Amino acid sequence: MSQNLSQTFLAITRNDTDLEWLQGALAPLGQVVSAGGGSLDELLALVDVTFASLVFVGLDRDHLVAQSALIEGVLEAKPMLAIVALGDGMDNQLVLNAMRAGARDFVAYGSRSSEVAGLVRRLSKRLPAVTPNTQLG
């Protein structure tokens, strides 16, 4: 039998429609929780609470510098975390900026559910097991 793959993923998306698309695509693997508006401290706190090992960050041209800085900041604080950027797949600048900031991969909004789930499965196999920190002092 297959192992229990129920995980929690965090996502910063453009809107509720994009969040719902991501939740639908990843429903067989776990739950996708909105990480709010993109505050670094808020995102890091959610990672600690949910033990998420994968975070989706939506990118757009209007906020690209701040979104790239967010990816860099998260990875500086939590280097073992995997970041997957979301955005317009036809916009090469978004893809390049995501990779330069340290994202592991890029997914175009509206991609097929099987593609998104396959990507998450592959990334999850490469990530270290996340265990709760029992030393909270």
Tell me the role of every PLM-derived stretch.
Residues 2-26, 35, 56:
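Conserved acidic segment of CheY-like receiver
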Residues 130-137:
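Walker A (P-loop) phosphate-binding motif
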Residues 42-43, 53-74:
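Conserved phosphotransfer microenvironments
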Residues 31-39:
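Short hydrophobic/Thr-rich beta-strand motif most characteristic of the beta2 strand and flanking loop
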Residues 80-90:
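A short, hydrophobic beta-strand element within the central beta-sheet of small alpha/beta folds
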Residues 111-119:
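C-terminal output helix
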Residues 75, 96-100:
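Alpha4-beta5-alpha5 "output face"
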